[in-house]
């Protein structure tokens, strides 16, 4: 029986609907009000009534308004044309919305996610008679700098034989590309695009692997001390203004991935505007073209309805999984998952559910875990590899890492990059605290060496705390030297100048080279007559290494600075291993 319904109650963006007929959980409905149709999602079903969260402002909705049931889940359209686009959480292209509406977007306006008029040059790789299943490739089109594979839709459950496939040429996303037939004789027309529900993971692959290969970000403190693996997960918690968004932008520019997807879910409008303005101007170091050519942005600012924040996170991860199915490496950056969790808390309160810690819903941990678990590296049907790496920033109030969202995130991620107010106020970038952060993945530098360096940083911090109480004169020369060496490692290796063309991105070879040099200095034993002499010597080393950081690797100036550094160290200690 076809469902019929009317509005019987409205609380904020939660609408209660009286229903006659059969409905399903997470079904999309349209509320007819004032000549508009507002999209909503059913989130609770009770006897004769359902509750739906509306993705728009609910002003004007009245008791008795009619409901249109779609019998479909919230889906995204997948196909050529997703890259370089800016979408809202419901996959409406924002530039086209702005062209139609001006500065203030209208309610109830939903546009096609993909350009239906643009023609793509299709190159067939399959042929008539081939046996295919969901996720298999029929051919490809060139989208920006990547080969966008045209696939059998993921919802096809049978094995099919190709009975017809078009020749190479230009086609729109709605044109027939192929006709496939199953064993029962049922034929299906395949086009370049199809829809997929955002809350259901795409699982059309042979095998899921354990992430092991490092995803090189070219940020020293991450790659060396707290690495992220391709197909892994990481989080960047930190107080407001600590540099989370900037660190994510630097990562997206330099990371060793094919495609970057940014989900700005609930960030302040000013930060989202900054991202939208900066990204088209950024040059991709790999291609020399605009970074936007391999980027897709899904944005819902904190001023937009809360329900759309949740949608934007799921839309982004689904698009990431789609490109993973082509054998590509994807990086998804969610900024910020705290605002998504706050949206869940708001909706949970309206549903009158029993609250958990700090009024967050009791199911907060399982929802966050289900999102991060969609990351991973997989073996596809043709034997190639694809990965989705997920990084979420968390904005705990006051930088308190003990709050529920941070704790729920820490239980499921593989790396933790904790930013602190103390380091950001000291103008240290990245402001990642080397003593609180951790990673379960393998980095670009040998693990034993990095552990030795971290122990050195911990000792240096202990001595620094002691000096705040007893002063420099209250500690031995040996302890003071340990403190100076830890500061040398911090300033010359853990910090980076993102505005310098050389120091902004450091490849693994250079990271290993510079770390070995510093590692030898940490292990060397120096003798000084006074603390003043020790400080002067370490300051000379620091300036020399900082100059090397700003100089292109292995060029003449770099080599001269290296010789100068070795001579300086040799003057105080003969067994310097870099000599």
Swiss-Prot record:
Enzyme's top EC category: translocase
Residues that, per the record, bind ATP: 238-245
Pfam families registered for this protein in UniProt: ATP-synt_ab, ATP-synt_ab_N, ATP-synt_ab_Xtn, ATP-synt_VA_C
Gene Ontology molecular function terms on file: ATP binding; proton-transporting ATP synthase activity, rotational mechanism; proton-transporting ATPase activity, rotational mechanism
Protein's UniProt keywords contain Ligase: no
NCBIfam families: PRK04192.1
The protein, known as: V-type ATP synthase alpha chain
EC number(s) stated in the UniProt entry for this protein: 7.1.2.2
Reaction catalyzed: ATP + H2O + 4 H(+)(in) = ADP + phosphate + 5 H(+)(out)
Stated family: Belongs to the ATPase alpha/beta chains family.
KW Kinase (keyword) present: no
Record keywords: ATP synthesis, ATP-binding, Hydrogen ion transport, Ion transport, Nucleotide-binding, Translocase, Transport
Role according to the record: Produces ATP from ADP in the presence of a proton gradient across the membrane. The V-type alpha chain is a catalytic subunit.
Example GO biological process: proton motive force-driven plasma membrane ATP synthesis
